[in-house]
Amino acid sequence: MQSTSAQSSASHPERVFNFSAGPATMPESVLREVQDEMLCYPGAGASIMEISHRDKLFVDVLHDAESTIRELLNVSDDYSVMFMQGGATLQFSAIPANLLRGSGKRAQYVLTGSWGKKAVKEAKKEGDVDVLFDAAESNYDHIPSASDLACPDDAAYMYYCSNETIQGVQFPTEPNCPDSVPLVSDASSDFLCRPLPIEKYGLLYACAQKNAGPAGVSVVIMRKDLLDKADPNIPGYLHFKNHHDNDSEWNTPPTFAIYVLGKVARWLRDDMGGLEKMESINHEKSQQLYSVIDSSNGFYRGHAQTDCRSLMNVTFNLPSDELTAKFIAEAAEHKLAALKGHRSVGGIRASIYNAMPREGVNALASFMNNFASKNS
């Protein structure tokens, strides 16, 4: 596979730079490898989508995906790595079902954006929940300071979303959490964008379709001592121990999505050189766009406060709705696609996940400069 950060727009005459928040752009080299193997997976005599999930060929694919993720994140044997379906939405329910229901404890939630709000709504169906921090009054433009978080030592767990795609707010590091309390993270939109101290977490999960592969599979990394905490009467698919005990095959897993996820993980390891190098590239790409915003004399106004700007989702507004619509339309003419911001924030959202090539960021930065010059 190629060693560049992703595709060139010249690779196909109709291919654009895709800034979608998810499902999102993927490495072209991975897409081409999948294309080459689509009709007949090596040694199978059939497509990877056609063989049984119990077939040794697919079991090897699953194990390879798991081992590559473990290698990238330095995940120890104290943790289970599971592949599940249902996206982050399922995890909003599964986590409190496993760690809160019947515990006699209270879960602590940190709300820095829309996905945290959705998670706490589901958690309240399973037990007692406290909101430790909520940035709603500022439309979720910042993260808490250390003094804002006073998590009790006896909490069931503390939950946060490491990167809020809609608001473009990201924790630069883990929030303070007592050692006695499992730290739980929705890492869906910044999974594998940088190294992580996995040992600080009780549970970390990510749906793949933003930064790690296609829609249909979620990765759950869970400390094994927490697997037995759940009420045995919770619905079977929600019970993490069922997935751990059955090697992510408690039911038929999303075979194709796991297969592609494994290829993306190997691309990160073999082509990009691992997560430290990927993090450096992500800092460079995001800073290029933030520099345009900061030097625009107020024409572009970033949503997130500067100390928590996202590496993955660059959000900003223009002086008027009319200019925003014009920006989106003209950008599309330059093959810069899917830039419309979420309705709750408005403006522009440029999602520049791992697979967004430097060429795409260069093209967007150049367009932003030219657009501001012509419309200021």
Swiss-Prot record:
A GO MF label: pyridoxal phosphate binding
Gene3D superfamilies given in the database record: Aspartate Aminotransferase, domain 1 (3.90.1150.10), Type I PLP-dependent aspartate aminotransferase-like (Major domain) (3.40.640.10)
Keyword check for Transferase: yes
Sequence positions that bind L-glutamate: R54
Keywords, in A-Z order: Amino-acid biosynthesis, Aminotransferase, Cytoplasm, Pyridoxal phosphate, Pyridoxine biosynthesis, Serine biosynthesis, Transferase
Domain of life of the organism encoding this protein: Bacteria
Residues that bear N6-(pyridoxal phosphate)lysine: K210
Reaction(s) this enzyme catalyzes, per UniProt: O-phospho-L-serine + 2-oxoglutarate = 3-phosphooxypyruvate + L-glutamate; 4-(phosphooxy)-L-threonine + 2-oxoglutarate = (R)-3-hydroxy-2-oxo-4-phosphooxybutanoate + L-glutamate
GO biological process: L-serine biosynthetic process; pyridoxine biosynthetic process
Names of required cofactors: pyridoxal 5'-phosphate
Chain sites annotated for binding pyridoxal 5'-phosphate: A88, T89, W115, T165, D186, Q209, N251, T252
Subcellular location: Cytoplasm
One Gene Ontology term, aspect cellular component: cytoplasm
Enzyme Commission numbers on file: 2.6.1.52
Cofactor binding: number and manner: Binds 1 pyridoxal phosphate per subunit.
Pathway: Amino-acid biosynthesis; L-serine biosynthesis; L-serine from 3-phospho-D-glycerate: step 2/3; Cofactor biosynthesis; pyridoxine 5'-phosphate biosynthesis; pyridoxine 5'-phosphate from D-erythrose 4-phosphate: step 3/5
EC supergroup of this enzyme: transferase
Subunit field text: Homodimer.
Similarity section: Belongs to the class-V pyridoxal-phosphate-dependent aminotransferase family. SerC subfamily.
Known function: Catalyzes the reversible conversion of 3-phosphohydroxypyruvate to phosphoserine and of 3-hydroxy-2-oxo-4-phosphonooxybutanoate to phosphohydroxythreonine.
Protein name: Phosphoserine aminotransferase
Organism from which the protein derives: Rhodopirellula baltica (strain DSM 10527 / NCIMB 13988 / SH1)
